[in-house]
């Protein structure tokens, strides 16, 4: 059941989604509805697939929190989180790609994020930036974070071979009882998990085991971002689907003859939405990670 505060946020966000409210109908400045309805939003048309209001409420977001966003990409969630937290006395820490390492594509993503979010402090606040690097390191001061968010990037950590370590670094950054919210393209529950997640999909049990092995407690799962039309069997992995609509293998020229219509009809991927918590007491014995293919 929603709290009174969550119900109010949901109401104001719903008004924001109904068009251009004016006067008394406009969401209050600084509310989550205001942040969701702002003209600064990145690709708000994706809300029908990613359900940011329901997802953020499920994870427990509040305006005064310190939030750690791991690998924010181009900033789809940053464009919601940064204004909302800045308006309410909260703080956003963005742990992005290492500008001194990684791939050219990762550096280009980082540069695009920086160009968008580092020049308007009156809107986005002063976002603290840290690095997710191959060498490891603190993502935030130990025990300083209320909520950490991993949105559609567990597969990236797996591809780089650093998923287990980063989950541990997130745990260290969180306050006792702090939460970790995960959104991730969901693989079929049968078969072996590709340890590099080459198609972008990860089994839900595998993500849970990664978190529990790091010391997290599982809290709850939501199907708010589920898409039963996603068969997961696409020629270019999850990137065959919107919003990417890839038409050729990575590194190859686009294929203008490739028919994207069937994949547009599917919509964005089927996704798990999970919530974990850092224990408030002594850490539990880690769980074993499920089998993966060699």
Task: List the predicted regions and their residue ranges.
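N-terminal secretory signal peptides and thylakoid transit peptides that target proteins
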Residues: 1-14
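Helix-to-beta-strand junctions that scaffold the AdoMet/dcAdoMet cofactor pocket
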Residues: 86, 158, 174-175
């Amino acid at each position: 059941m929603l709290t009174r505060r969550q119900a109010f946020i949901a109401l104001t966000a719903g008004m924001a989604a109904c068009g251009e409210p004016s006067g008394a109908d406009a969401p209050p400045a600084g509310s989550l509805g205001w942040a969701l309805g702002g003209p600064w939003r990145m690709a708000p048309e994706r809300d029908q697939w990613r359900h940011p209001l329901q997802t953020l409420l499920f994870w427990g977001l509040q305006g005064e929190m310190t939030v750690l966003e791991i690998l924010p990409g181009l900033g789809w969630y940053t464009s919601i989180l940064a204004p909302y937290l800045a308006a309410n006395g909260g703080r956003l820490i963005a742990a992005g790609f290492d500008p001194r390492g990684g791939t050219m594509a990762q550096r280009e993503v980082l540069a695009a994020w920086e160009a968008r979010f580092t020049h308007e402090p009156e809107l986005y606040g002063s976002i603290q930036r840290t690095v997710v690097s191959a060498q490891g390191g603190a993502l935030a001061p130990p025990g300083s974070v209320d909520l950490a968010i991993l949105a559609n990037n567990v597969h990236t950590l797996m591809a780089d071979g650093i998923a287990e370590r980063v989950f541990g670094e997130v745990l260290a950054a969180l306050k006792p009882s702090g939460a970790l919210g995960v959104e991730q393209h969901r693989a079929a529950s049968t078969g072996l998990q590709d340890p590099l997640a080459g198609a972008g999909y990860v089994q839900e049990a595998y993500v849970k085991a990664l978190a529990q092995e790091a010391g997290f407690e599982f809290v709850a799962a939501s199907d708010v971002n589920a898409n039963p039309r996603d068969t997961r069997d696409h020629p270019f992995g999850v990137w065959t689907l919107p919003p990417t609509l890839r038409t050729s293998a990575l590194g190859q020229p686009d294929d203008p003859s490739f028919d994207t219509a069937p994949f547009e009809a599917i919509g964005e991927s089927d996704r798990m939405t999970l919530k974990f918590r850092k224990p408030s007491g002594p850490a539990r014995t880690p769980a074993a990670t499920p089998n993966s293919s060699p």
